[in-house]
């Protein structure tokens, strides 16, 4: 019978975690239909079946780590049903065989998983629940057998919430503290919450530590007077929206264009080390950090040197929406040359951003704060000021070049007409 294997994803991705089975055992599967969601280091991707039939075996469970090329499901012949629970009663031999196989798999799982994902001898007694409900139940330690479905005899997430909100039975009340004490006995007097890190969070933690350990990272600072760029934006924003189908003119396009100009002037900032070689990139794919519920993601705006302000703004907006809706593809997340992060949207006045992997530097933007500035010896004016930071790999970039790069950014933002002329 045809197997479904973890597909090739990207050069830097070798494994993933099964986030959710989108199909239950016994469900009908169409050719090209997604059967599970796989969480990778960068994005979540759906794995599809290359054959039509029935999902006859799940060779891995939600939460399991699987490698590229590994078989994770078997597609059998037949039309299938809405779920395994509604399978035909006239195939007892097949049901017994499936039950025995399921028992073997269950004995190899941890006690906690077995409690939630238990399989009875009779398939008809197996709890009918949506994949997301099974995952939610496992994360919250809820036994699905104790949950009463509201509609169609299928347990859903809201049924689990209702079960948790209901007054607990005496047995449950007595059992819960014992489990808590066993799990958190190293914190006997203080309340804590322990939860498993997501794959993306674990990967981010690992890579951030690798960058800190494997680069000679240093940060230099400067400040930018935002007066001129704010006035230009105020004058042009309405006409800009009319001319470009509602696309808004923001500050990111100015900083992106300024970064491209500075990268051309200081090409070592657009480089990376590969073994004993230094690779200087001749393209300008700028990463823009986007905050999501799953953490910080860095999709890339491609060929920024060839795009105008409107195209850059539209692409940034599109990538931000895709990131928050979890629709980013792997192509959006790899092979960038430089990154910009804006901590100012969260109120950060100053920071030392960490370099993105396979890059030599990252530009940090911050809050715009009005403060008194000495214009000359006799004049002090309140000006909208922003601190900017450049974290860089000192193995590649000397201090002189780093300071010069940041000074170029400052000069271009303070004289935005020069950016418009360059574009």
From Swiss-Prot:
Sequence similarity: Belongs to the 2-oxoacid dehydrogenase family.
Reaction(s) the record says it catalyses: N(6)-[(R)-dihydrolipoyl]-L-lysyl-[protein] + succinyl-CoA = N(6)-[(R)-S(8)-succinyldihydrolipoyl]-L-lysyl-[protein] + CoA
Organism listed in the record: Staphylococcus aureus (strain MRSA252)
Source organism phylogeny: Bacteria, Bacillati, Bacillota, Bacilli, Bacillales
Protein name: Dihydrolipoyllysine-residue succinyltransferase component of 2-oxoglutarate dehydrogenase complex
Gene: odhB
Annotated catalytic residues: 394, 398
PROSITE patterns per record: BIOTINYL_LIPOYL, LIPOYL, PSBD
Presence of keyword Phosphoprotein: no
Function of the protein: E2 component of the 2-oxoglutarate dehydrogenase (OGDH) complex which catalyzes the second step in the conversion of 2-oxoglutarate to succinyl-CoA and CO(2).
Cofactor: (R)-lipoate
